[in-house]
């Protein structure tokens, strides 16, 4: 790599003749030709066209001189991991067949490589490759007979799409494909198969400060990306610092769209899956500690920006990242239809799934029709989920979970110690927030769904004994580990939210310890003490007695609630102060789409009356218990919650929910 700053401009055009030199007069034909030589300060301008290649940047930029790859026309340059497959012949009925010589795949054949690994709970029967008809990712079958039948998958979110099937087998040095195109002639349609594993991703660590702007990035044969493994995607920085991925459309990944994930550690890569003898949770702890040894530091990894991207139709995650996403920002993105086929299943599926989201900001995104919206697992210390619109992150009515599938919700914070802040969001799915964690602040949200996994979802019972799940917490605003602790539960703050029971209560799903709890409100926090009740146990005016206090060292932590509004029977915590409880009116809140823009249709703001509260700030929220860190900005400065969903000023006092006033709630949400 070179830090030499050159400020060259290279041009690329898929329609160019071969042998170009990157000049405007003689552009390169392939983006990777420019990626092999671009140095700090250089810009690569790519003409509209389809680029069937893997782009592997060789050199890093610098903080003041990034290497910029730019589509000349926004979304005009399409980089794809797929190739067109022609020459289909009729097999029988709607079934066609085609053959591909395996030489095209090199050392990685997606049609012999299975989706599998740590935390993968579905059967290991799907390949990393995929077949597409007119940009629709078809559904893989386990047998040819299933492909021939062409029946809808009862678990798929889209029943009609699930009738488009494909099946593969090997015959010598050829991959044989069968496909049910439901009456379409594949020789008259655009039929492609994914060939390349990645689209735009370095093959080594430390290729820092790259900007990728305005591309369509699509159709890669990506692999399952669990947290204690190398995590790939269609595009990603591969364990580096300072990437910007902006104004891109990222879609049709077999597994993950954008990866901000973990490097390859040969001694801890799918350890549980390949060696069996240690638990995957233990290997996650090892991944954190080994990461410290391998340079997981603020100065070397993370601080990426993902902005204004359209991420959709990926089958594991839209955006994934273990440890490599620290100090990053994901903003103004539209993320939807993730893990909808239900062909893949496991504990790593969501619109955004991050482990160790230290000081990560997720803001102003629209996330919908995903198996989950945002899932922050382990070490979401300093993470902030703010000003997002989330809805329909649940299985459609009548769809059952496939084998290995996860539950659904808008925001899931798992086994973290905080401080994690969820503020100024619109959360309209059936289950809004799942928190088998501690140190969570839920502030100024509109919440139409339930809380779930309260005082649950953390430890396992193995050999008739409790096996606590110890997870790390960190030096404030750093990656260095400060300690490990199990989850005591509690230490939560719930202020100035609007709760409404939007969906009917399911009498069989009224358990707040369940991920499918159907009861909206805060009564589920009754099991935790108030601060006054909790602190009294420690007898602060007496000499400490280690034995006597041990009970409370491992007991529940306190909770704080105030200023919330409750509608349609949403229940209320006994510790709540200054609540508005409306038992007379019926509140409504729905997202409405008009001409591609999204609005909120609600009567709530006419029901709030004169109910107001004071402005919150970091000092009022206090510090999360284990890391002893405030709910504050990544730079350590205080947050004053005087701005709403749109950054409108709230004034000297505030109403609950994400909007400063009724008029603000009428504006375009996204």
Where are the regions that the model predicts?
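Bacterial Sec-dependent signal peptides at the C-terminal "C-region" and cleavage site
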Residues: 1-5
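Extracellular polysaccharide-degrading/modifying enzymes targeting complex plant/algal/animal polysaccharides
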Residues: 6-239, 244, 249-296, 464, ...
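Right-handed parallel beta-helix
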Residues: 208-221, 241-255, 265-291, 298-317, ...
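A conserved amphipathic helix/loop scaffold
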Residues: 458, 474
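Short, contiguous acidic/charged loop-to-helix segments that flank catalytic cores in large enzymes
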Residues: 410-416, 432-436, 482-486, 550-555
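Short catalytic-loop micro-motif centered on adjacent basic/acidic residues
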Residues: 45, 236, 318-320, 374-375, ...
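Beta-rich catalytic cores
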Residues: 231, 315, 348
